[in-house]
Amino acid sequence: MITIAGAGLAGLACAYELAQRGAAVRIYERATEIGAGSVSRYAGGMLAPWCERESAEEEVITLGGRAIDWWAKVTSVHRRGTLVVAPPRDRAEITRFARRTTQYRRVDGPEIAELEPALAGRFSQALFFDQEAHLDPRRAIRDLAAAVSALGVEICLGTDAPGAVDLDCRGIAAAGQLADLRPVRGEMAILHCPEVKISRTLRLLHPRMPLYLVPRGDGRFMIGGTMIESTSARAITLRSLSELLNAAFTLHPGFAEASVVETGAGLRPAFPDNLPRLHQDGGTLFLNGLYRHGFLLAPAMAQQVANRLRPETQDENHRERQTA
């Protein structure tokens, strides 16, 4: 029996990989509802390795390249790509962004309008990453938990993990046992605006704080992008909320009539290089530091965990990144 502390994104992904390889798995989760204790409930759900490469290391591509197909096995994935835009005064940001990544094509005003008619006449140039995708994080976590349960994994909700477990996936709650793990605050808002029709992730570039908007269906959109070095998990600040709402209005003036149906803030666990790690401490393996790349990198990291805990099933063609 392999025991796991934490039934958030990382813990469930690891349980899925382990159970698929024939392991008996039990997960302990302090929250009484799937996803309630996970910072992933505030995530954008973008499966966007090439966009993330602009501000991250090469590993976001090498580790995140298979995430779309992995998630498509357990939940709905929208393969609509990502459109990166900038207001006229920040047009140089498009060139800067393009220099730091690949797998895009430049599109002009008419092409932007063809991709997203709601943006017609609003932007004259953009980058289109047609291989990227997005998902609904909360639905994805529920679907992953259902898939894990169907494989025979026991999920013990409302239960503290015992003192010794095989795998620790508790995110920022494990900071006391991982010396260089730090919290990075992220904030978001969910808007309801059925008048605006947008079908794919939009990234709005800005020199100080680039933001993203992700469609959730039924006229709902998630907007986020803040990254604040902070230990505070208090509600979203007025400054951050105003910046998010101004960004939505910049994308489309129709958002001026949007209802703000939810706001939230959470603490993402991150190491100094903002990449996830495996760390062995006695009999416990830690997976942590998914930062803002949880849905993108959790599948590959879960495969590494399964290779470590079930070495007899290891795929030798899978390149591991392990840091002890």
PLM regions with names:
Residues 127-161, 169:
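Helical element adjacent to the flavin cofactor pocket in flavoenzyme catalytic cores
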Residues 3-5, 28, 162-172, 302:
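Short hydrophobic core segments
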Residues 258-324:
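C-terminal catalytic lobe of FAD-dependent flavoproteins
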Residues 16-17, 47, 76-78, 172-282:
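Active-site substrate-recognition segment that forms the wall
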Residues 44-115:
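Dinucleotide-binding Rossmann-like beta1-alpha1 core, especially the glycine-rich loop
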Residues 20-39:
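Glycine-rich FAD pyrophosphate-binding loop
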Residues 2-26:
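N-terminal Rossmann-like FAD-binding beta1-loop-alpha1 element of flavoenzymes
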Residues 55-65, 85-92, 127-143, 235-239, ...:
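Short beta-strand to alpha-helix junction loop
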